Curated annotation (Swiss-Prot):
Protein purpose: Controls vesicular trafficking from endosomes to the trans-Golgi network (TGN). Acts as a negative regulator of TLR9 signaling and can suppress TLR9-triggered TNFA, IL6, and IFNB production in macrophages by promoting TLR9 lysosomal degradation. Also negatively regulates TLR4 signaling in macrophages by promoting lysosomal degradation of TLR4. Promotes megakaryocytic differentiation by increasing NF-kappa-B-dependent IL6 production and subsequently enhancing the association of STAT3 with GATA1. Not involved in the regulation of the EGF- and EGFR degradation pathway.
UniProt protein name: Ras-related protein Rab-7b
The gene coding this protein: Rab7b
Membrane topology term: Lipid-anchor
NCBIfam families in UniProt: small_GTP
Classification lineage: Eukaryota, Metazoa, Chordata, Craniata, Vertebrata
Modified positions (Phosphoserine) in chain numbering: 186
Pfam families: Ras
Chain ranges for the short sequence motif Switch 2 as given in the UniProt record: 67-82
Length: 199
């Protein structure tokens, strides 16, 4: 029996102020609704261990502050991340419109910069009745960007686990592809090189 592989992944969650990033993260990691609203200054980090595709994943999830004045500081946390959740509030059209800026900012800062960087979009607060962002508009935007979309509620724990685990699965695939490419590159031999002989 093979021992289960272990992989550490760094995920980030970004979006405008007040969309519920911290509540989503607490619901996923602790199965509790984070009722007390406090602005995240900079970033906070929570970890969760899950088993996915016979691999033990240690997810280090960075909850970033959504205030404009912290954006330049927060963007330094994007470096080295393996995947990103773009969150918005379905009752706040401006938070949805800001997703382009958040997405572009993440893609500009990740290292290494590449197009296959996994992202998922979460429309939070579907438990509220005053929805202002239609599903059709969001689905169109996500289809154009080739990103999965989840309608979620941190308060009622709707689709939260599924969304995080789809991102984790995509990040794992990317990680495995990167690790495989490094292995292939490191074992390539140049043909025709003479071997040195001793005595």
């Amino acid at each position: 029996m093979n021992p289960r592989k272990k992989v550490d992944l760094k995920l980030i969650i970004v979006g405008a102020l007040g969309v519920g990033k911290t509540s989503l993260l607490h619901q996923y990691v602790h199965k509790t609704f984070f009722e007390e609203y406090q602005t995240t200054l900079g970033a906070s980090i929570l970890s969760k261990i899950i088993i996915l595709d016979d691999t033990t994943l240690k997810l280090q999830i960075w909850d970033t502050g959504g205030q404009e004045r912290f954006r330049s500081m927060v963007s330094t946390f994007y470096k080295g991340s393996d995947g990103c959740i773009l969150a918005f509030d379905v009752t706040d059209p401006e938070s949805f419109e800001a997703l382009d800026i958040w997405r572009d900012d993440v893609l500009a800062k990740i290292i290494p910069m590449e197009q296959s960087y996994p992202m998922v979009v979460l429309g939070n607060k579907i438990d509220l009745e005053d929805r202002k962002v239609s599903q059709e508009v969001v689905h169109g935007w996500c289809k154009e960007k080739d990103m999965p979309y989840f309608e979620v509620s941190a308060k009622n724990d709707i689709n939260v686990v599924q969304a995080f685990e789809v991102l984790a699965s995509r990040a794992l695939l990317r990680y495995q592809g990167t690790a495989e490419n490094h292995l292939i590159d490191s074992i390539k031999l140049s043909p025709g090189q003479p071997k040195s002989r001793c005595c």
